[in-house]
Amino acid sequence: MKKIITLAALCLMFVNNSYAAGSDSSTEVVKPSSYSGIVKLIKSEKYEEAIQGLEKILEQNKYKQDPDILTHYAFSLRKTKNYTKAEEYYKKALSVDPGHRGALEYIGELYVDTKRLDLANATLKKLENCRCEEYAELKSYINK
């Protein structure tokens, strides 16, 4: 009986940790302990520091396919105007999770930033049916 309770508690902890990042990703893995601090750096617009931290995380094989980490890395790159590398990493995130709303929104914003409105609008169309925050934000970004 003790083993069952312990196993159930471990399962609940895993599920709770898996979704702590607020992702819509179905390919979620438990994030490294440094990840929440890196997200805070991004929210504080400290993109260079975030890039350094995310690069350390991405050196570990188990995180190279995490769409949330890839998206945050691409976002930070885009904010430092490294558009080519940012696009590469958004596409990596989307190859893992084609419906990742954050990656879709942000790659759409990258297309606007790089004057490719046709691609931005095509990306917006992919978000159209979700009627989610990402759709509204990308639509607003396109219409600025």
Language-model segments: which ranges?
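TPR/TPR-like (Sel1-like) alpha-helical repeat modules
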Residues: E105-E134
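Structural marker of alpha-solenoid helical repeat scaffolds
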Residues: Q60-K62, V96, L127-C130
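Canonical tetratricopeptide repeat
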Residues: H72, Y106, L138-Y141
